């Protein structure tokens, strides 16, 4: 059951299924009306540096859509790529992809890397190999050099901004609740 829809149904003295049908009719209309205010990759400033990270927005558990299952998070959801400025302001959110899509593939499919110079932007280890500024992985059975450790520390001191932006996004119930 959808508690929000049940509450709306009680307030308007109609059934929950009626509310569900009304929501289903108006959702695409609202999305179309708001589309002009949704920034796309092409709207990003080509001269600005961005911090990129991916997040999983949980969704209902569809047994007939196994591609929504994220092995990393052990739940179903959609993969969103998020970009923020160095001042910590949300700049862009990608269209959703299935939860089983790796961040590197998701950022490639979003068009971000084609629209902007990848070498300017900061990401986590999930984006290694895409030309972005990323931390260095520790070699198997080895240690990082001191310069790599300092480099990783510098990158991670900046990356906290995108983590805060994503945490702020997820305060919206629809982006953190499995419904």
What would you call each of these model-derived segments?
Residues 2-179:
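Short, well-ordered secondary-structure "scaffold" segments embedded in the functional core
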């Amino acid at each position: 059951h959808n508690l929000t829809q049940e509450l709306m149904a009680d307030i308007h003295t109609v059934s929950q299924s009626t509310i569900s049908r009304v929501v289903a009719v108006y959702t695409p209309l609202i999305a179309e009306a708001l589309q002009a205010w949704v920034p796309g990759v092409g709207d990003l400033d080509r001269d600005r540096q961005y911090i990129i990270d991916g997040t999983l927005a949980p969704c209902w558990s569809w047994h007939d859509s196994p591609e929504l299952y994220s092995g990393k998070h052990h739940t179903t959801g959609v993969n969103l790529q998020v970009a923020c400025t160095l001042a910590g302001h949300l700049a862009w959110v990608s269209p959703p992809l299935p939860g089983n899509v790796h961040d590197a593939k998701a950022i490639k499919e979003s068009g971000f890397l084609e629209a902007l110079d990848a070498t300017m932007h900061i990401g986590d280890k999930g984006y290694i190999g895409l030309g972005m500024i990323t931390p260095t992985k520790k070699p198997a059975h080895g240690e990082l050099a001191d310069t790599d450790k300092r480099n990783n520390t510098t990158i991670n001191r900046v990356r906290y901004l995108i983590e805060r932006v994503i945490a702020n996004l997820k305060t919206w119930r629809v982006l953190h609740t499995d419904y």
